[in-house]
Amino acid sequence: MSSAQRVVITPGEPAGSGPDLVVQLAQRAWPIELVVCADGALLTERAAMLGLPLSLLPYSPDVPAAPQPAGTLTLLPVSLRAPAISGQLTVENGPYVVETLARACDGCLNGEFAALITGPVHKGVINDAGISFTGHTEFFEERSQAKKVVMMLATEELRVALATTHLPLRAIADAITPALLHEVIAILHHDLRTKFGIAEPRILVCGLNPHAGEGGHMGTEEIDTIIPVLDELRAQGMKLNGPLPADTLFQPKYLDNADAVLAMYHDQGLPVLKYQGFGRGVNITLGLPFIRTSVDHGTALELAGRGKADVGSFITALNLAIKMIVNTQ
């Protein structure tokens, strides 16, 4: 990188393993500045519980970004609303979690930070606090006023984007419209080019129904919706292969000639990716006006404060964000 950049990290649920993982991230030097939006006392306490060194440096947006020395983090303080006890959810801290996300998002929007890396949150406790919260993806979409965002998970070997995200199965067929597919594929194609540096992205597209509809005998969404959209976009120069049956698409015959897979719904594409690379995956939100990556796992409340949480996915998410920053320069 030509000069140091500054990224912002949110540890997520304070009672979970997120704060532990952030402390573990700090045990190595980084070529960028790591600004953590969190309660400083919480991070200091977790470092002590893990027996790891940690010095918190004050965040100053007026000071040029510098590489992060090992054993340190730059702190952008947000105060807990109640004490955080490892492994025990506290509804009073639901607003704290949302406040960290809002401050980090706003910092990306105003140019303070080059990317945002998020730790795992507990959706239930946030909603129990009276805050409507579906997930990070939807939260950042609304706060950034993005027209549309796309959820994509990635490992070193595989990228899977979703046409729909957190919808019940009975609602998915109605949600797969020509307008939706045009938007999702356009965003996926654009961000693969601009954020991943792929000049001509090759995208595999899953069918919605078993056997991709079997010529209309197992559903007509492929014939009525998916195929016409793909034909239109191919005519514009996009390299799209599909719709293909999801039960046979995930094999080298297809994947060796593709840069990403577009699945029609959450549990069509993600089980394969998580089986192939759980703990090494990264969640990326495409379509935002900034770079956002995240771990691919949950809060792991039972591991909080015990030093047993695996930092691998967080390291991968941070490294991918750094690569994406380079690609967009």
From Swiss-Prot:
Q: Which residues hold a divalent metal cation?
A: H166, H211, H266
Pathway in which the depicted protein is active: Cofactor biosynthesis; pyridoxine 5'-phosphate biosynthesis; pyridoxine 5'-phosphate from D-erythrose 4-phosphate: step 4/5
SS bonds (residue pairs)? none
**GO cellular component terms, semicolon-separated:** cytoplasm
Q: Which Pfam families match?
A: PdxA
One GO molecular-function entry? cobalt ion binding
Localization, per the record, is:
Cytoplasm
**Which HAMAP family does this one have?**
PdxA (MF_00536)
PANTHER family annotated for this entry?
4-HYDROXYTHREONINE-4-PHOSPHATE DEHYDROGENASE
General remark:
The active site is located at the dimer interface.
- The name on file for this protein is 4-hydroxythreonine-4-phosphate dehydrogenase
